[in-house]
Amino acid sequence: MCAGTFDIIHPGHLFYLSEARKYGDKLIVVVARDETSKTFKGKHPIHNEKERLEAVRMLKIVDEVVLGKQGNIFDIIEVIKPHVICLGYDQNVQKRQLEDELKKRGVKAEVIRIDSYMPHLYKSSKLKK
C-alpha cells in the first residue's frame, strides 16, 4: 500500500508506485482527500480528489485505488490492513512513529521508505510553478 496526493502525476510518482509494487502481490493506492492534502501541504490541490482518484486508477501498475478517510489518516490503514506500507521520500510521516501507531492499532505491516527519483526535476511543488 502507498498513499499520496498525486495532484499532477509525473515520473517521480511513477517511480514511487513501481518501487512500491515490488513489495507485494497487489498495489493499493490511497489518494489523499482534498482537506487532508490542504492540512499537510497548506493548500488545496489543483485537481480535486475525484479527478486525482481517476488519474491514479488509469495507471496499469495500480491494482486498486481508494480515497483516504476524512479525519485520521490511520483509519484507512485499519480498513485495508496492508502487509507493507511504502512511504515516499518526501512524506513527512516518520517511519518509527508510523510503526508505533500501527502497533497500537494491531496492524502488522512493514514500513518502507522509497528513495527519490530525480527530486530536482520531479517534485509536484516544483512542477506547479
Language-model regions, residue ranges each:
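Nucleotidyltransferase catalytic core that binds NTPs
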Residues: 1-129
